[in-house]
Amino acid sequence: WASWCLPCIAEAPHLENLKRQGADIVGVAIRDRPEDVARFLAQHGNPYSRIGRDDLSEVQLAIGSSGVPETFVIDGQGVIRYQHIGDVRASDVPVLLAELEKAR
């Protein structure tokens, strides 16, 4: 995700919903400044248990991400089990929860 990403704003309440339902969401801020990340989180909420920085898009490229926002379900071994391209919408929440359950 990124503070400059408009679809990231749209998905923010749905990520909060996932968090409320028990999802552990780890964010990776793509090409972003810490002060902009802090402002975004203050305005739109913070569903993340942790946030990493990817100033050069190295993580993004390594996992095969095509852009922001993008959501991955990663199992306990670090294997990507599901990839959702684009912003998370209300209709995607049950799908993501099911994929999280399968990845356990």
Language model features with spans:
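Thiol/disulfide oxidoreductase modules built on the thioredoxin-like
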Residues: 42-47, 54-101
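Extracytoplasmic/periplasmic copper-protein system
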Residues: 104
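Conserved redox-active cysteine motifs that mediate thiol-disulfide chemistry
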Residues: 1-17
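Short alpha-helical
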Residues: 6, 32-36, 58, 88-91
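Conserved segment of the thioredoxin-like fold in thiol-based oxidoreductases
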Residues: 10, 21-56, 68
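Surface-exposed amphipathic alpha-helices with a cationic face
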Residues: 16-19, 101
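Short amphipathic alpha-helical segments and helix-helix/interface helices
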Residues: 15-16, 38-41, 97
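Short "lid" loop at the C-terminus of a central beta-strand within the Rossmann-like core
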Residues: 14, 30-32, 86
